[in-house]
Amino acid sequence: MQFRTVLDVKVVDVEKRRNPSKHYVYLINVTYSDSTSHIIYRRYSKFFDLQMQILDKFPIEGGQKDPKKRIIPFLPGKILFRRSHVRDVAMKRLRFIDDYCRALVRLPPQISQSEEVLRFFETKPDDINPPVEDYGSKRKSGLDSSEPMVLEQYVVVANYERQENSEISLKAGETVDVIEKSESGWWFVSTAEEQGWVPATYLDSQSGTRDDLDLGTSRSGEVTKRRKAHLKRLDRRWTLGGIVNRQQSREEKYVSVQAYASQGKDEIGFEKGVTVEVIQKNLEGWWYIRYQGKEGWAPASYLKKLKDDLSPRKKTLTGPVEIIGNIMEISNLLNKKAVSEKDIQTDGEATTPERHISKSEISLPMPYAPEAGVAPTVVTALGMNSGSSATLQENKSRAEPGSPAIARVAPHRVEIGSPNLRQKPPPRRDANLAFQLPKPPEAPTVEAEYYTIAEFQSSISDGISFRGGQKADVIEKNSGGWWYVQIGDTEGWAPSSYIDKRKKPNLSRRTSTLTRPKVPPPAPPVKKQDSEEGPSLGGSASKAPESPQRVYEEPEYDVPALGFDSELDCNPPKPKTHNSPKPEPRKFEIKSNPAAAERIAQAGKASPLLKVMTSPLRKRNSLENINKEEVIYENEGFRFSSDDFASGCDSHTPRSLTLGRKPFGSSSGGGKPLRKVSPDLNRSHSLGRAERHSSKLFSDESARNPKREPVMRKDVEIRIGQSPLARPKPVVRPKPLLTKSEPQSPERMDISSIRRHLRPTGSLRQGAIRAMRGEDSETASVVSSEDSTSSRSTSDLSSVYSKGSRGGESDHESVLFRTTDAYERAQESELSFPAGVEVEVLEKQESGWWFVRWGSDEGWVPTFYLEPIKHTHNVGIQESRDSPLVDLGSTNKSNSLEKNEQRVQALNNLNQQNLRSMSNPSPPIPSKPPGGFSKPTAMLNGSSVRMRNGVRQAAVRPQSVFVSPPQPLKETNIHTGSLRRNESLGAGDHLRSTGGVRRNSSFTAVRPQPVTDVRVRAGTTITAPAGSSSPLIAQRNGIPISTVRPKPIEKMQLIHNNLREVYVSIADYRGDEETMGFSEGTSLEVLEKNPNGWWYCQVLDGLQGRKGWVPSNYLERKK
């Protein structure tokens, strides 16, 4: 081979060749590097072989490892089920092969000058002296040559369900293209979507004739032969064998390969291995045969040609031989004249006295007696002698079906086998169908569209690049795996593996949950509530009061509520008006006896404690409509009085409580509703021990702020779900880690995040501050007063922790804070700052993260790194333990209570720090979210986050608060008995003689007294019986606070207690690699308490005390 390269290639034309078989070659003008050019001739199969060689030799350039790196051009795929050796197909391929050749020679030299490419374009002897064929007068015009290219179309006459994988299902009225006809009666057809085998008896020609179903000869001595060599690789029986119409007029003899029992009067049964004479063949799978002097129909797949019958046939081939290259050309035989100039290779023609079969004769329906099972309906002759013709004429005159006719097939007879095995015959055609069938309806169309499923970057000139999810219009499908599509205004070839089909979406059903965030966003703004759903367990819904204001219903998400198996509604949120029907309340599965559950549900309808969690946007004049409820307190629990369960609530008051509105967010994203969940809430699982003592409660809520929503309503749902008779096991583990407030996307932005952009001014800001303040009570405090001065650190912490989270008391409250330590941000939305700089607080959230501005930078920072520059509140408290009944309408008392609460939380935070600094180092706090509530924050670096200081854990605060008289650090070892759960340890204040706030202690039974007037802050419920000395503030997150005086705690009692805190577990807990497991009733000593709800404890029951982190809501103070 001379070494010369190819400079240019151009495909100019196609040419038909008949040696060795009919095919087309492409005329290619090749320009070589030696400035010579030649015309070479290559057929498509040669291009295909070249492409395979190149792809095998250059896998990387062929895109086998990475499709994006493919530079080898694409070649049009092979045509497997259509005729490829026709001129029209060759002309369609010409443009693509020309592009392929041009791109191939422009590839890098290692490919374009490879041995395979040069050998392909090398001039061969056949290219210099191409074979010359004498076409004579065979082709007068190009029209005749393109006639066989069009596939015949048939209409499906009845529905057909596929029986095997190689078959396809059909629907009546559908139009199919017949690709291959088989003598077994199974045809290979193509629909708009798929190809496969179907019984021919389910198809009817669109022209109404059935002449194309039969194999026949119109002259004696002709041999009809089918060849489809290029499809042999599909491993199917593509050939039917030769059919000879001898001058001796002998019927062909076949041997039965399987026994057949006749199913009708016109059929012939036979045993296996017998010889039968085939009188007539057709392509529907049923042949007319003669056996033992009887004639009838038999399945063609049960018959096999006798081998000894082939030799005499060859000897008697004296007439012209007609070679038909494709089964589709058989239909042309009956449409031609006596001599077809197109396909005859010899001009010899024999004449016989045998008559020719006309087209009209083939299509005539045959009469048949109605009592017959299945009748032949079409006469089709297949080159028979005069004796056979006489037999047919004689059979026509009889009423019995003896004529060789195509039996119409009953579609319901679907005992079919595999088209590959061809053992079972196809169903017979029903006589009633015949040609009296009405015109079948149009095929049903299913509106579908194509779309891209991934991004694709094309590296070829006629390719197309696209992104995932784009709509694509498929213009042409290529079997090689490349489709010509249009995306937008561009067209090009795209890999079919990147394109998928889907049903065209209906605009009225575009409520897919795919775009819904998996994490519920913060609660939306709540307008003035006119009505809320009644309790789901009670089954009674309250009627909405008449009000022109609209109520925005909370959206519901596919997130389960804490500790419940709820039936969640996936409907999007809809605005509710005062006259809109209430949705069905959500049902929860509460593990308790039904009676107890019902009592709790009914009590929840008007519980003042539950009303604390409902919207604070109520008018003061609604006080007159508030009913009385009895609440029982013992130790740390509460329970509704059973004698008042049936009282219900006024359906026309705004006191109707939403029990099934929305499960609060338990997710991995950490939205705002998620951070409202505290271990204090879980403590409520052990509430409600007895029903012996009760006290009357009144509640009222003032409408202050229209921009806040009481998300702690969801906490109340959990509390209601607990059993009132038995101590329930905790169903929710505490949240060990606070996930910070994420910067929200526009679709998830709520009113609290909008406040950062549109800060409230004037009275609106005051209302927001007051509303937030009323909702944010952290613990209830019953503090006997003795005025004492707290240290600066206590005051600072008090304002930061308690007052600061409320957003400030008034407009003149200081918004400037000073950083106490350096902080490095862990996310983009946070703000890093050094120690000792002044920052301006733009938004305060109770989650423990504030949005501040430092210079020109803004971002979220933890509150424990900030201290106020100017203090506006004094934490001095003046209150007597034996004071008379508190005037609940007094503003001074409310302020005093809030100051007490601030002091409690400040002392608690300070002492938490002291306690952790004094205690021994403990293992790292579990970083996983217990109960699946929150995604653990990945930023747990020790120095910057300061886990021991509660950073990122402000949303989950200590279980209970006991304010002991603070002691100097040096006296801590003396007053060890003053500590209760999460109590202060070594605060900077002096010891006071008054009692502190305690939650876990037993309360004295006090006779509840009715109170007629209630004046409280928005979002709180304060009730005091006669004889009580201290007002109570109900905690915002739902922890019940006793309304009676606590048992006095004397100074000596506090002193004589030791530092050792022993708790007992109230339920079994399975530990893991980060936490310690224990069984119910295990005694544990608390070594360290973390405000996020995890306590570091030591087991006291075993010989070797195990240590580890345990959830605090599984523990109860050992009495």
Curated annotation (Swiss-Prot):
Adapter protein involved in invadopodia and podosome formation and extracellular matrix degradation. One of its GO terms (biological process) is neural crest cell migration. Residues 388-429, 494-595, 641-815, 914-941, 957-1004 are annotated as: Disordered. Keywords: Cell junction, Cell projection, Cytoplasm, Phosphoprotein, Repeat, SH3 domain. The lineage of its organism: Eukaryota, Metazoa, Chordata, Craniata, Vertebrata. The keyword Phosphoprotein applies. It comes from Danio rerio. It comes from the Eukaryota. The PX domain is required for podosome localization because of its ability to bind phosphatidylinositol 3-phosphate (PtdIns(3)P) and phosphatidylinositol 3,4-bisphosphate (PtdIns(3,4)P2) and, to a lesser extent, phosphatidylinositol 4-phosphate (PtdIns(4)P), phosphatidylinositol 5-phosphate (PtdIns(5)P), and phosphatidylinositol 3,5-bisphosphate (PtdIns(3,5)P2). Binds to the third intramolecular SH3 domain. It is found in: Cytoplasm; Cell projection, Podosome. This is SH3 and PX domain-containing protein 2A. SUPFAM superfamilies: PX domain, SH3-domain.
